[in-house]
């Protein structure tokens, strides 16, 4: 953590988006703490620069896989910092984050994936990967987990 804050391939979508505010705060607040999480009893902290770097890397990975403006991104995971970074990464590319309950059974997700025409999904763990692999043949657009 702690490299370059902005990637020139990320479009500027305006001052009022979550991703734009993260990048602006990274420039203004840099090393100051942006978010903290207690994991296994130990507090973890990320600076604004760290968060912007994570969001930029996620956005770069999504873009490399073909994620473009207007795409919907399913996000399935615990209520943790990386989940929110996925929201911002999607929005930084002009995409739409679609959060889904991680405890939903696979069959319950099929409708959402098809109705929202979701092509991409970011998931927290192997359990969620397995769930999506199980329903992938029934999800008309899903192509990247």
What are these regions (language model features)?
Residues 16-17, 53, 81, 104, ...:
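Residue-level recognition of alpha-helix initiation/capping sites
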Residues 1-46, 50-65, 69, 87, ...:
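N-lobe entry segment of adenylate-forming
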Residues 17, 72, 108:
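Amphipathic alpha-helical recognition patches that constitute DNA-binding helices
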Residues 42-44, 59-104:
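Conserved AMP-binding/adenylate-forming
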């Amino acid at each position: 953590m702690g490299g370059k804050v902005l990637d020139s391939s990320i479009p500027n979508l305006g001052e009022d988006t979550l991703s734009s505010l993260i990048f602006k705060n990274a420039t203004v607040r840099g090393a100051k703490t942006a978010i903290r999480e207690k994991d296994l009893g130990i507090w973890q902290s990320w600076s604004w620069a760290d968060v912007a770097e994570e969001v930029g890397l996620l956005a770069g990975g999504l873009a490399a896989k073909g994620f473009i403006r207007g795409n919907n991104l399913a996000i399935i995971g615990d209520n943790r910092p990386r989940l929110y970074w996925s929201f911002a990464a999607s929005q930084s590319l002009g995409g739409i984050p679609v959060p889904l309950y991680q405890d939903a059974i696979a069959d319950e997700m099929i409708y959402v994936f098809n109705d929202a025409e979701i092509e991409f999904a970011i998931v927290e763990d192997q359990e969620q990967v397995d769930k999506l692999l199980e329903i992938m043949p029934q999800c008309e657009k899903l192509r990247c987990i």
